[in-house]
């Protein structure tokens, strides 16, 4: 390349000396043109400059595509392989990520189910604990003590007209909702009353006063009237001894002659007079 440029510099001053119009002087023009680039318009196609340059350019052109031809086919293959490797790596990462995400979902689902089971078990325990106090029947305590439930207290019964202990009262027919003990039936207060010993004597005295014979002597009736007045009082009963005494006094009064006739006329015997019943024949004669 340096030799060709030197040849061109030497040939140009010779040509330029023949044509002085193109430059100022022959000497000066040659020196200037040697330092500057060659004139392309002044050269012909048959000049050796282009002939020498053309093959070199062709050689460069031929070698340059050849190098690109050798390099270009290899680069797509490398890019393709790297791309495949990258895609495989991404797919592997995707698989790993998917597995990790799936494991996390499974763990969260297990934790949720475990928490639900614990919550259900806790709720069941709470229900049992809350239901256990309800099974115990609490007895309410009022501020004022009950007169009927006090220990060792007595209550006045208007029907019996006496004081009765709280244990002797009959139980209520309606069971109490607060007491859980079984109700025990107590003895009726009516059965607790002892029968009166003077009851049959009172009835006997009343029957004797109602069925009194009318044919007794006046003295006997007077004596009996005082006894009847005593019997009419409540709570007074005449014993059998007093009745025997009245009968003996009646017998002694019959010893007088004036009174014997009156007593002998009566058909009633002393035994019948003492009995409270009157025969049917006597009632029919009356």
Swiss-Prot record:
Biased composition (Low complexity): 177-187, 245-256
Sequence positions bearing Phosphothreonine: 148
Sections of the chain in a coiled coil: none
Main location: nucleus
UniProt biased composition (Polar residues): 258-269
Signal sequence extent: none
GO biological process: mitotic G2/M transition checkpoint; positive regulation of cell growth; positive regulation of proteasomal ubiquitin-dependent protein catabolic process
The keyword Nucleus belongs to this UniProt entry's keyword annotation: yes
A molecular-function term among this protein's GO annotations: protein phosphatase inhibitor activity
Gene Ontology terms: cellular component: cytoplasm; nucleus
Keyword Cytoplasm carried by entry: yes
UniProt entry keywords in alphabetical sequence: Cytoplasm, Isopeptide bond, Nucleus, Phosphoprotein, Protein phosphatase inhibitor, Ubl conjugation
Chain segments carrying region Disordered: 1-46, 166-187, 238-286
Modified residues (Phosphoserine): 34, 36, 44, 47, 61, 75, 142, 146, 186, 188, 266, 269, 275
Covalent link location (Glycyl lysine isopeptide (Lys-Gly) (interchain with G-Cter in SUMO1)): 88
Function: Acts as an inhibitor of serine/threonine-protein phosphatase 2A (PP2A) activity. Inhibits PP2A activity by blocking the substrate binding site on PPP2R2A and the active site of PPP2CA. Potentiates ubiquitin-mediated proteasomal degradation of serine/threonine-protein phosphatase 2A catalytic subunit alpha (PPP2CA). Inhibits PP2A-mediated dephosphorylation of WEE1, promoting ubiquitin-mediated proteolysis of WEE1, thereby releasing G2/M checkpoint.
PANTHER family associated with the record: FAMILY WITH SEQUENCE SIMILARITY 122B ISOFORM X1, PPP2R1A-PPP2R2A-INTERACTING PHOSPHATASE REGULATOR 1
Subunit (UniProt): Interacts with PPP2CA and PPP2R1A. Interacts (via its N-terminus) with PPP2R2A; the interaction is direct and this interaction inhibits PP2A activity. The CHEK1-mediated Ser-36 phosphorylated form interacts with 14-3-3 proteins.
Name this polypeptide is given: P2R1A-PPP2R2A-interacting phosphatase regulator 1
Source organism: Rattus norvegicus (Rat)
Record gene name: Pabir1
């Amino acid at each position: 390349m340096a030799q060709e440029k030197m040849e061109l510099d030497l040939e140009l001053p010779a040509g330029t000396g023949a044509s002085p119009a193109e430059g100022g002087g022959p000497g000066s023009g040659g020196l200037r043109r040697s330092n500057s680039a060659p004139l392309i318009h002044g050269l012909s196609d048959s000049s050796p400059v282009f002939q020498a340059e053309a093959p070199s350019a062709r050689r460069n052109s031929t070698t340059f595509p050849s190098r690109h031809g050798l390099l270009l086919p290899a680069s797509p293959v490398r890019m393709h392989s790297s791309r495949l490797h990258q895609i495989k790596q991404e797919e592997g990462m995707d698989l790993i990520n998917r597995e990790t995400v799936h494991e996390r979902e499974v763990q969260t689902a297990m934790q949720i189910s475990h928490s639900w089971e614990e919550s259900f078990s806790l709720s069941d325990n709470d229900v049992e604990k809350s239901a256990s106090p309800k099974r115990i029947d609490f007895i309410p305590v009022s501020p004022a003590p009950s007169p009927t439930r006090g220990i060792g207290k007595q209550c006045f019964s208007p029907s019996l007209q006496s004081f009765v202990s709280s244990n002797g009262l009959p139980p209520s027919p309606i069971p109490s909702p607060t007491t859980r003990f079984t109700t025990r039936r107590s003895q009726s207060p009516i059965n607790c009353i002892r029968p009166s010993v003077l009851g049959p004597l009172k009835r006997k005295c009343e029957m004797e006063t109602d069925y009194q014979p009318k044919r007794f002597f006046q003295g006997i009736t007077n004596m009996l009237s005082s006894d009847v007045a005593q019997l009419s009082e409540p709570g007074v009963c005449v014993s059998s001894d007093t009745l025997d005494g009245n009968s003996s006094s009646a017998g002694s009064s019959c010893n007088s002659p004036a009174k014997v006739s009156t007593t002998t006329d009566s058909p009633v015997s002393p035994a019948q007079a003492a009995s409270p019943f009157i025969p049917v024949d006597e009632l029919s004669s009356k």
